[in-house]
Design a protein with these regions (language model features):
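Post-cleavage N-terminal segment of exported redox proteins
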Residues: 2-70, 166-225, 229, 242-250, ...
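Aromatic- and histidine-enriched alpha-helix N-cap/loop-to-helix transition segments
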Residues: 13, 119, 186, 190, ...
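Short glycine/threonine-rich turn/loop motifs
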Residues: 40-148, 212-315, 319-322, 328-334, ...
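Non-catalytic, well-ordered alpha-helical scaffold segments
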Residues: 122, 140, 161, 189-193, ...
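An amphipathic alpha-helix signature
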Residues: 143, 164, 174, 192, ...
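C-terminal accessory segments of extracellular proteins
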Residues: 326-373
Protein backbone atom coordinates (compact mmCIF):
# COMPACT_ATOMS: atom_id res chain seq x y z
CA UNK A 1 0.00 0.00 0.00
CA UNK A 2 1.02 3.65 -0.32
CA UNK A 3 1.52 3.81 3.46
CA UNK A 4 4.48 1.45 3.10
CA UNK A 5 5.78 2.93 -0.15
CA UNK A 6 9.39 4.17 -0.04
CA UNK A 7 8.73 7.61 -1.53
CA UNK A 8 12.19 8.91 -0.68
CA UNK A 9 14.00 6.23 -2.68
CA UNK A 10 11.49 6.60 -5.52
CA UNK A 11 12.30 10.32 -5.81
CA UNK A 12 16.08 10.02 -5.53
CA UNK A 13 16.51 6.94 -7.72
CA UNK A 14 13.75 7.38 -10.30
CA UNK A 15 12.05 10.80 -10.36
CA UNK A 16 15.23 12.89 -10.30
CA UNK A 17 17.05 10.99 -13.10
CA UNK A 18 13.90 10.98 -15.25
CA UNK A 19 13.34 14.70 -14.67
CA UNK A 20 16.95 15.45 -15.61
CA UNK A 21 16.49 13.45 -18.80
CA UNK A 22 13.37 15.44 -19.70
CA UNK A 23 15.20 18.74 -19.21
CA UNK A 24 18.10 17.61 -21.38
CA UNK A 25 15.70 16.42 -24.08
CA UNK A 26 14.00 19.83 -24.13
CA UNK A 27 17.35 21.59 -24.41
CA UNK A 28 18.55 19.26 -27.18
CA UNK A 29 15.30 19.89 -29.04
CA UNK A 30 15.87 23.64 -28.98
CA UNK A 31 12.69 24.37 -27.03
CA UNK A 32 13.14 27.63 -25.13
CA UNK A 33 10.96 28.79 -22.23
CA UNK A 34 11.53 32.48 -21.33
CA UNK A 35 12.21 33.32 -17.69
CA UNK A 36 9.27 34.55 -15.66
CA UNK A 37 6.55 33.00 -17.82
CA UNK A 38 6.17 29.97 -15.55
CA UNK A 39 6.55 29.27 -11.85
CA UNK A 40 8.74 26.32 -12.80
CA UNK A 41 12.33 26.88 -13.91
CA UNK A 42 12.56 24.40 -16.76
CA UNK A 43 16.36 24.64 -16.74
CA UNK A 44 16.58 23.14 -13.24
CA UNK A 45 17.56 19.47 -13.33
CA UNK A 46 15.39 18.44 -10.37
CA UNK A 47 12.19 19.64 -8.68
CA UNK A 48 14.36 19.95 -5.57
CA UNK A 49 17.11 22.15 -7.01
CA UNK A 50 17.55 25.50 -5.26
CA UNK A 51 16.44 27.25 -8.44
CA UNK A 52 13.61 24.83 -9.32
CA UNK A 53 11.04 27.62 -9.02
CA UNK A 54 11.23 31.06 -10.61
CA UNK A 55 10.84 33.91 -8.13
CA UNK A 56 10.19 36.27 -11.06
CA UNK A 57 6.91 34.51 -11.86
CA UNK A 58 5.56 35.66 -8.48
CA UNK A 59 6.77 39.23 -9.04
CA UNK A 60 5.48 42.37 -10.78
CA UNK A 61 6.52 43.03 -14.43
CA UNK A 62 10.14 42.55 -15.48
CA UNK A 63 11.23 46.13 -14.77
CA UNK A 64 10.57 45.40 -11.07
CA UNK A 65 12.31 42.02 -10.81
CA UNK A 66 14.85 41.39 -8.07
CA UNK A 67 18.33 42.92 -8.42
CA UNK A 68 21.24 43.08 -5.93
CA UNK A 69 20.72 46.84 -5.60
CA UNK A 70 17.05 46.39 -4.69
CA UNK A 71 17.87 43.67 -2.17
CA UNK A 72 20.39 45.99 -0.48
CA UNK A 73 17.90 48.86 -0.36
CA UNK A 74 15.06 46.60 0.76
CA UNK A 75 17.14 45.12 3.56
CA UNK A 76 17.84 48.60 4.94
CA UNK A 77 14.19 49.65 4.71
CA UNK A 78 13.10 46.36 6.30
CA UNK A 79 14.96 47.20 9.51
CA UNK A 80 14.28 50.93 9.54
CA UNK A 81 11.30 52.32 11.55
CA UNK A 82 11.05 55.20 9.09
CA UNK A 83 7.90 53.69 7.53
CA UNK A 84 5.90 53.56 10.78
CA UNK A 85 3.73 56.41 11.93
CA UNK A 86 5.56 57.02 15.20
CA UNK A 87 8.98 55.93 13.86
CA UNK A 88 9.34 53.15 16.45
CA UNK A 89 8.50 49.98 14.50
CA UNK A 90 10.04 48.34 11.45
CA UNK A 91 9.24 45.13 9.57
CA UNK A 92 12.04 43.49 11.56
CA UNK A 93 10.31 44.31 14.86
CA UNK A 94 8.00 41.35 14.28
CA UNK A 95 9.84 39.46 11.54
CA UNK A 96 13.12 39.04 13.39
CA UNK A 97 15.95 37.52 11.30
CA UNK A 98 17.44 35.71 14.31
CA UNK A 99 14.09 33.95 14.88
CA UNK A 100 13.65 32.83 11.27
CA UNK A 101 11.72 36.06 10.61
CA UNK A 102 9.12 35.39 13.31
CA UNK A 103 8.90 36.86 16.82
CA UNK A 104 8.51 33.77 19.04
CA UNK A 105 5.14 34.97 20.36
CA UNK A 106 1.71 33.33 19.99
CA UNK A 107 0.49 36.67 18.62
CA UNK A 108 2.40 39.94 18.25
CA UNK A 109 1.68 43.16 20.07
CA UNK A 110 0.12 46.12 18.31
CA UNK A 111 1.95 49.40 17.88
CA UNK A 112 0.90 50.49 21.37
CA UNK A 113 2.76 47.45 22.83
CA UNK A 114 -0.36 46.62 24.85
CA UNK A 115 -3.00 45.33 22.46
CA UNK A 116 -2.46 41.78 21.16
CA UNK A 117 -3.06 41.28 17.44
CA UNK A 118 -5.20 38.45 16.12
CA UNK A 119 -2.72 36.17 14.35
CA UNK A 120 0.69 34.58 14.70
CA UNK A 121 3.66 36.13 12.86
CA UNK A 122 4.62 33.84 9.95
CA UNK A 123 8.15 33.30 8.70
CA UNK A 124 9.23 35.21 5.62
CA UNK A 125 11.45 32.43 4.29
CA UNK A 126 10.18 31.49 0.82
CA UNK A 127 7.29 33.95 1.22
CA UNK A 128 7.92 35.07 -2.34
CA UNK A 129 7.01 31.66 -3.77
CA UNK A 130 3.25 31.95 -3.37
CA UNK A 131 0.30 33.69 -4.96
CA UNK A 132 -1.46 34.53 -1.69
CA UNK A 133 -0.21 36.57 1.26
CA UNK A 134 -1.54 36.74 4.85
CA UNK A 135 -3.18 33.80 6.61
CA UNK A 136 -6.48 34.77 4.98
CA UNK A 137 -4.92 35.09 1.48
CA UNK A 138 -6.31 38.61 1.00
CA UNK A 139 -3.24 39.94 -0.85
CA UNK A 140 -1.73 38.51 -4.01
CA UNK A 141 1.82 39.85 -4.33
CA UNK A 142 4.22 40.98 -1.63
CA UNK A 143 3.99 44.64 -2.66
CA UNK A 144 0.27 44.71 -1.87
CA UNK A 145 0.79 42.82 1.37
CA UNK A 146 3.41 45.30 2.49
CA UNK A 147 1.19 48.28 1.79
CA UNK A 148 -1.56 46.83 3.98
CA UNK A 149 0.82 46.30 6.90
CA UNK A 150 2.34 49.79 6.70
CA UNK A 151 -1.09 51.44 6.61
CA UNK A 152 -2.68 49.20 9.26
CA UNK A 153 -3.37 51.37 12.32
CA UNK A 154 -2.51 48.60 14.78
CA UNK A 155 0.59 47.30 13.03
CA UNK A 156 2.60 50.29 11.75
CA UNK A 157 0.10 53.14 11.34
CA UNK A 158 2.27 54.63 8.64
CA UNK A 159 1.85 56.07 5.17
CA UNK A 160 3.95 55.15 2.15
CA UNK A 161 3.03 58.51 0.64
CA UNK A 162 4.40 60.39 3.66
CA UNK A 163 7.46 58.12 3.75
CA UNK A 164 8.38 59.26 0.24
CA UNK A 165 9.06 62.77 1.57
CA UNK A 166 11.11 61.43 4.51
CA UNK A 167 13.23 59.20 2.28
CA UNK A 168 13.92 61.98 -0.23
CA UNK A 169 15.50 64.03 2.56
CA UNK A 170 17.96 61.24 3.43
CA UNK A 171 21.18 61.42 1.39
CA UNK A 172 22.03 57.72 1.75
CA UNK A 173 18.54 56.58 0.83
CA UNK A 174 18.57 58.92 -2.17
CA UNK A 175 21.74 57.23 -3.40
CA UNK A 176 20.38 53.73 -2.81
CA UNK A 177 17.13 54.48 -4.63
CA UNK A 178 19.01 56.04 -7.56
CA UNK A 179 21.07 52.85 -7.93
CA UNK A 180 18.12 50.50 -7.52
CA UNK A 181 15.63 52.47 -9.63
CA UNK A 182 17.61 54.80 -11.92
CA UNK A 183 14.60 55.56 -14.13
CA UNK A 184 12.11 56.46 -11.36
CA UNK A 185 11.82 58.99 -8.56
CA UNK A 186 11.06 57.62 -5.09
CA UNK A 187 7.40 56.63 -4.94
CA UNK A 188 5.02 54.39 -3.02
CA UNK A 189 5.39 51.39 -5.28
CA UNK A 190 9.16 51.21 -5.47
CA UNK A 191 9.40 51.48 -1.68
CA UNK A 192 7.18 48.40 -1.48
CA UNK A 193 9.03 46.72 -4.34
CA UNK A 194 12.43 47.22 -2.70
CA UNK A 195 11.32 45.57 0.55
CA UNK A 196 9.56 42.85 -1.44
CA UNK A 197 12.76 42.25 -3.42
CA UNK A 198 14.60 41.69 -0.16
CA UNK A 199 11.92 39.26 1.02
CA UNK A 200 12.08 37.44 -2.33
CA UNK A 201 15.80 36.93 -1.71
CA UNK A 202 15.07 34.99 1.49
CA UNK A 203 15.27 31.55 -0.07
CA UNK A 204 15.45 28.55 2.25
CA UNK A 205 15.93 25.59 -0.06
CA UNK A 206 19.24 24.06 0.96
CA UNK A 207 18.37 22.12 4.10
CA UNK A 208 19.77 18.69 4.95
CA UNK A 209 16.71 17.15 3.32
CA UNK A 210 17.43 19.01 0.06
CA UNK A 211 21.07 17.96 0.10
CA UNK A 212 20.06 14.33 0.61
CA UNK A 213 17.53 14.32 -2.18
CA UNK A 214 20.10 15.88 -4.52
CA UNK A 215 22.46 12.98 -3.90
CA UNK A 216 24.31 13.44 -0.59
CA UNK A 217 23.10 10.27 1.13
CA UNK A 218 24.98 11.09 4.36
CA UNK A 219 22.56 13.89 5.27
CA UNK A 220 19.64 11.84 6.70
CA UNK A 221 19.54 9.07 9.27
CA UNK A 222 17.13 6.12 9.31
CA UNK A 223 14.53 7.83 11.53
CA UNK A 224 14.48 10.95 9.35
CA UNK A 225 14.05 8.87 6.19
CA UNK A 226 11.19 6.95 7.77
CA UNK A 227 9.70 10.26 8.88
CA UNK A 228 9.64 11.58 5.32
CA UNK A 229 7.91 8.45 4.03
CA UNK A 230 5.32 8.73 6.82
CA UNK A 231 4.89 12.43 5.99
CA UNK A 232 4.17 11.53 2.37
CA UNK A 233 2.06 8.47 3.14
CA UNK A 234 0.33 7.36 6.31
CA UNK A 235 0.32 10.78 8.01
CA UNK A 236 -1.08 12.50 4.88
CA UNK A 237 0.89 15.68 5.63
CA UNK A 238 1.86 16.13 1.99
CA UNK A 239 -1.77 16.31 0.87
CA UNK A 240 -1.71 19.93 2.13
CA UNK A 241 2.00 20.74 2.59
CA UNK A 242 3.11 20.12 -0.99
CA UNK A 243 6.71 19.40 -1.91
CA UNK A 244 9.17 20.97 -2.54
CA UNK A 245 8.11 24.12 -0.63
CA UNK A 246 6.10 22.17 1.97
CA UNK A 247 3.41 24.84 1.89
CA UNK A 248 0.10 25.28 0.08
CA UNK A 249 1.58 26.05 -3.36
CA UNK A 250 -0.19 23.44 -5.48
CA UNK A 251 1.81 21.26 -7.89
CA UNK A 252 2.47 20.73 -10.72
CA UNK A 253 2.22 24.40 -11.76
CA UNK A 254 2.50 26.14 -8.34
CA UNK A 255 0.25 28.98 -9.50
CA UNK A 256 -2.33 28.72 -6.70
CA UNK A 257 -1.97 28.61 -2.93
CA UNK A 258 -4.40 26.50 -0.95
CA UNK A 259 -6.20 27.22 2.31
CA UNK A 260 -7.59 24.61 4.71
CA UNK A 261 -10.19 24.39 7.48
CA UNK A 262 -8.63 22.49 10.38
CA UNK A 263 -10.82 23.25 13.37
CA UNK A 264 -8.03 24.90 15.38
CA UNK A 265 -8.92 25.42 19.06
CA UNK A 266 -8.95 28.81 20.74
CA UNK A 267 -6.80 27.59 23.64
CA UNK A 268 -5.17 24.34 24.75
CA UNK A 269 -7.94 23.74 27.27
CA UNK A 270 -9.82 20.56 26.30
CA UNK A 271 -12.49 20.66 29.03
CA UNK A 272 -14.27 21.70 26.94
CA UNK A 273 -12.32 22.73 23.84
CA UNK A 274 -13.49 25.84 21.97
CA UNK A 275 -13.17 26.51 18.25
CA UNK A 276 -11.07 29.59 17.55
CA UNK A 277 -13.45 32.40 16.58
CA UNK A 278 -11.27 33.84 13.79
CA UNK A 279 -13.22 33.29 10.54
CA UNK A 280 -10.12 33.57 8.36
CA UNK A 281 -10.66 33.82 4.62
CA UNK A 282 -14.43 34.21 5.12
CA UNK A 283 -13.84 37.77 6.35
CA UNK A 284 -12.95 38.70 2.76
CA UNK A 285 -14.81 36.10 0.69
CA UNK A 286 -18.33 35.70 2.08
CA UNK A 287 -18.82 32.05 1.20
CA UNK A 288 -19.51 29.50 3.93
CA UNK A 289 -16.86 27.13 2.58
CA UNK A 290 -14.21 29.64 3.67
CA UNK A 291 -15.29 29.98 7.30
CA UNK A 292 -12.25 29.31 9.53
CA UNK A 293 -10.12 28.78 6.41
CA UNK A 294 -6.43 29.68 6.58
CA UNK A 295 -3.56 29.49 4.13
CA UNK A 296 -1.33 26.43 4.47
CA UNK A 297 2.01 27.75 5.79
CA UNK A 298 5.43 26.36 4.98
CA UNK A 299 7.00 23.69 7.16
CA UNK A 300 10.49 24.74 6.20
CA UNK A 301 12.37 25.98 9.30
CA UNK A 302 9.46 24.71 11.39
CA UNK A 303 11.70 23.93 14.37
CA UNK A 304 12.60 27.64 14.55
CA UNK A 305 9.13 29.16 14.21
CA UNK A 306 7.17 28.11 17.31
CA UNK A 307 4.47 28.66 18.47
CA UNK A 308 2.29 27.16 15.76
CA UNK A 309 -1.03 27.58 13.90
CA UNK A 310 -2.61 30.88 12.83
CA UNK A 311 -3.28 31.78 16.47
CA UNK A 312 -0.08 30.39 18.00
CA UNK A 313 -2.08 27.98 20.19
CA UNK A 314 0.45 25.12 20.14
CA UNK A 315 3.92 25.51 21.66
CA UNK A 316 5.53 22.32 20.37
CA UNK A 317 5.54 20.13 17.29
CA UNK A 318 4.39 17.27 19.51
CA UNK A 319 1.20 19.21 20.31
CA UNK A 320 0.66 19.93 16.62
CA UNK A 321 1.08 16.27 15.71
CA UNK A 322 -1.34 15.19 18.44
CA UNK A 323 -3.94 17.59 17.03
CA UNK A 324 -3.60 16.17 13.52
CA UNK A 325 -3.33 12.57 14.70
CA UNK A 326 -6.73 12.89 16.38
CA UNK A 327 -8.46 14.38 13.34
CA UNK A 328 -8.05 18.10 14.01
CA UNK A 329 -11.15 19.86 15.30
CA UNK A 330 -13.15 16.65 14.94
CA UNK A 331 -10.97 14.97 17.54
CA UNK A 332 -11.69 17.83 19.94
CA UNK A 333 -15.43 17.77 19.11
CA UNK A 334 -15.29 21.34 17.79
CA UNK A 335 -15.01 20.73 14.04
CA UNK A 336 -16.85 23.24 11.85
CA UNK A 337 -19.13 21.69 9.23
CA UNK A 338 -16.73 22.67 6.47
CA UNK A 339 -13.58 21.14 7.99
CA UNK A 340 -11.34 20.09 5.09
CA UNK A 341 -8.94 18.05 7.22
CA UNK A 342 -10.05 14.40 7.13
CA UNK A 343 -12.09 13.54 10.21
CA UNK A 344 -10.54 10.10 10.69
CA UNK A 345 -7.70 9.56 13.12
CA UNK A 346 -4.29 8.84 11.63
CA UNK A 347 -3.40 6.13 14.18
CA UNK A 348 0.22 7.21 14.26
CA UNK A 349 2.27 5.60 17.02
CA UNK A 350 4.46 7.68 19.34
CA UNK A 351 7.50 6.36 17.48
CA UNK A 352 6.05 7.38 14.12
CA UNK A 353 5.27 10.87 15.43
CA UNK A 354 8.86 11.20 16.64
CA UNK A 355 10.09 10.14 13.21
CA UNK A 356 7.91 12.69 11.41
CA UNK A 357 9.14 15.45 13.71
CA UNK A 358 12.72 14.31 13.15
CA UNK A 359 12.15 14.63 9.41
CA UNK A 360 10.58 18.09 9.71
CA UNK A 361 13.68 19.29 11.53
CA UNK A 362 15.75 18.36 8.46
CA UNK A 363 13.97 21.23 6.67
CA UNK A 364 15.94 23.84 8.64
CA UNK A 365 18.06 26.15 6.48
CA UNK A 366 19.02 29.68 7.47
CA UNK A 367 22.07 30.06 5.22
CA UNK A 368 20.46 32.93 3.30
CA UNK A 369 20.22 34.99 6.48
CA UNK A 370 23.79 34.18 7.47
CA UNK A 371 24.95 35.47 4.11
CA UNK A 372 22.93 38.68 4.44
CA UNK A 373 23.73 39.56 8.07
Amino acid sequence: SFNEFDTLTFITDYVNPFYKCLVQTRINSGIDIPSGTSAINYNATSPFDEDALSINFYSPPEEYWVTPERILLGKKLFSDPILSGNKTRSCASCHQPEKAFTDGLPKPFALDNKTVLTRNTPTLYNAGFQTSQFFDSRADILENQLGEVVHNIQEMSGSLHKSVADLKKDVLYKQLFDRAYPKEPINNFIIANAISSYIRSLHSLNARFDQYIRGDKKQLNAAEKKGFNLFMGKAKCATCHFIPLFNGAVPPLYTTTESEVLGVPKTKNKNPAQLDDDLGKYLFIKSDVYKHSFKTPTLRNIELTAPYMHNGVFDTLEEVMEFYNNGGGKGLHIAPENQTLPFDQLDLSKKEIREIIAFMKTLTDTTTTKNLY
